[in-house]
């Protein structure tokens, strides 16, 4: 940009009456200045819970936060490590977890760049009805 300012075109003209100017500085296209936004890198991801209980047939939500809060790319990837036990329904920084069958599963959240991850262990308990 500085070079564009230094290379301004100067042209010599005949003197203009009633003035003492003999040079005019003409800029047919003024330089365009743009400021690119800075990229704020991700330094981590944190899930709100590291253990969670849910009953079969019931749902609960789990959320995660990208650190710092001002990070440029806050995209998260949710992974279910045991699809027989739970089902995931991700939506941005939140995932809905539905218990399918009794057992344990692990939910992993990973930043879009893949550098940071966190996990939560899900315990699915059988749905119990009131005994007679």
Swiss-Prot record:
It comes from Bacillus anthracis. Gene3D superfamilies: 2.60.40.1080. InterPro entries: Big_2, Invasin/intimin_cell_adhesion. Disulfide bonds: none annotated. To B.cereus BC1230. The lineage of its organism: Bacteria, Bacillati, Bacillota, Bacilli, Bacillales. SMART domains: BID_2 (SM00635). Residues 44-115 form the BIG2 domain. Transmembrane segments: none annotated. Pfam families: Big_2 (PF02368). This is Uncharacterized protein BA_1245/GBAA_1245/BAS1153.
